[in-house]
Amino acid sequence: MNRLRAGRPLALALLASTGLGAAVVLRPQLLGLPVAQVDLVATLVAGLALTTAALLSPRRLLSAGFLYLLMLILFHLSIPVVLALGGTLPVTFAAYIGTWYGSSDVTEAVYLSMLAVLALTTAYAWVQVRRGGNRPAPHPPAPTPPAFTRIGAVLVAAGVTVYLGTLVVVAPDLLRGGSYQEYLDTVGGTRTVAGATLVVAIGLCMAAVGAPGRARTLAWLLFGVFTLVTLSFGARTAAMFPAVAGVVAAAACARRVPRARTSVALIVAGLLAITVVQQVRGTGLAGAGPAAVSLNPMGSFAETGGTLRTVAEVVTWRRTYQEPPYHGRTYLTPVVRAWELATGRPRPPGNQDPRYAGVLLYQRYPDFQLGFSPVAEAFLNFGSTGVAVLFAGLGALLAGFDRRRLGHLGAARLGVLMYALSYTVRNASNAVPLTLIAGLLVIWCAARLLNRPPRPARRPVPVPA
């Protein structure tokens, strides 16, 4: 039995490698399959990837690798998975995907998404094998300073206050059950809301790594309020991505591996929240009664997978319109814009700069509300080879973090990284540099502040006799 367990990581790594090799070698055959068979293959790939990540990481279902894979699959492969499993789609969404799903470009989009999942899983598995399976790190890190947790709680409180204050001043109807469209028309995408959400995420990553106490409890309670408010008008990712980052950070420095029941309960609760929010975001809570809400997740999961269409559109640009590869330009745009700002060169506003992949998509399809996709951006820049290399690198990076138990600083940094990666699951990469710089800088400043040596006590001035 022990030999069987010892050989499991190697077997999973070989299985993932076989899947990746088959996807590369059999690419023409896969692209020529009927849609129903492509959906079935995508379902098998998703199951293999999630099983591999869950079994190889010491933190199981709360590892960074597993949760990132889950989100990547949820936003890119949930349509083919739901269709393969015979799930029932909402009438309006079924009519919507009927206008584009099933073409050869969509088949290649599904293939590219599977390639990304397999590349990430394979790299993740081999790093785990190289580091010796799923044994936990032997040396526990030092405890988190209470002041570090309190700083995180203060940041969460500040971010939630700014976010709610903005809603009260600019869009009070959202607090009375407004819809997601009202959110987009008023405060969605504004710098204030985006900045407040980032502050909440950074603060939550810092507070989550602390020991149980008032500060950590307060941070999670405030984030709970933030979650209820954002979910009430359908802004699901505003709460989802910080929550994933906070959970990953907390698990990364936990003294014990979270119980399977706890992990499953957290994931199921998150998926059910997505199910409910997906159904009420069109009308808001004010226009949705209990009879309009169903806990059957299949339709909601499929709607979440609409990000796949952004991949299909980029495939159309490259294949049908012969658009040349961008060779990394969209990834370098934040750096170029920062240089233009520093040197005083003219530049368009960020939401109108077509050098950003998401802006380019919006300018070509103004009715889209799908953000973008890391798979689409990698393919736009470097083709299918770029997709495989990029996601293999991500898999190796996440496996390196998941292999060992981190101290409070390392876990908080992992949380910030997870937030940046989560954000790009359905968006372009333009916010990643600022997110990482801001988060890592705040954590560094907090650590320096807490590690300053105390000032020496002043010597009393002698009083003359």
Each language-model region and where it sits:
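Small-residue-enriched transmembrane helix-hairpin modules in multi-pass membrane proteins
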Residues: 180, 272-394
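Aromatic-anchored segments of alpha-helical transmembrane domains
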Residues: 17-27, 71-84, 158-166, 223-231, ...
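Hydrophobic alpha-helical segments
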Residues: 367-465
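N-terminal "leader" segments that precede or initiate the main folded domain
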Residues: 1-136, 246-273, 430-447, 456-464
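Conserved luminal/periplasmic juxtamembrane motif of membrane-embedded glycan-processing enzymes
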Residues: 8, 12-16, 25-28, 234, ...
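Hydrophobic alpha-helical transmembrane segments
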Residues: 41-50, 114-118, 159, 167, ...
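Membrane-embedded catalytic interface detector for glycan/lipid assembly enzymes
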Residues: 33-40, 96-101, 125-256, 261, ...
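Membrane-interfacial loop-to-transmembrane alpha-helix junctions, especially the N-terminal start
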Residues: 5-15, 60-74, 151-152, 213-221, ...
